[in-house]
């Protein structure tokens, strides 16, 4: 059992503008407040894969397995040879849009149900919500300002700063 964590943001931009930035190779370099670097491994019609290095040096690999042009995508993220978490990015709306990110974090999911529930409730969920809200604010900030988001723009994060 893996409990999801989900956050979304309303954007005063149409879905095409939002899709253009979230589907751009290396876009985390411009939009992600905790990204040190986002390097592309593959980025073509059928294959999308990149590497995200956080400000604190953690390196995670993102492998996109579902690409729904103009609407969103699904990917697995994790250390190169480690367990992966599932992430779903979804755009809804037309002239004004909503960007939603849902993460199914693998961390501590191998614990018994009670331990996992407690860890998820008091550690994973609040930490991931803070992280996801900062990431979403980064996209909004980039779309409004058309400049790269300053690092830790919305506050530091104990897992990634």
Question: Can you name each region flagged by the protein language model?
Answer:
Residues 12-16, 65-70, 90-100, 145:
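A short, structured loop/turn motif at beta-sheet edges
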Residues 149-161:
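Charge-rich (especially acidic), low-complexity segments
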Residues 17-22, 28, 64, 75, ...:
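Hydrophobic pocket/interface hotspot
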Residues 1-43, 160-161:
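Hydrophobic ligand-binding cavity/cleft-lining segments
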Residues 79-134, 141, 150-152:
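Beta-strand/loop substructures that line and gate deep hydrophobic ligand-binding cavities in soluble
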Residues 4-6, 57-62, 83-88:
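Short, surface-exposed coil-to-beta transition loops
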Residues 48-55, 74-80:
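Short beta-strand segments that buttress and anchor functional surface loops
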Residues 60-67, 71-83:
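Helix-adjacent hinge/juxtasegments
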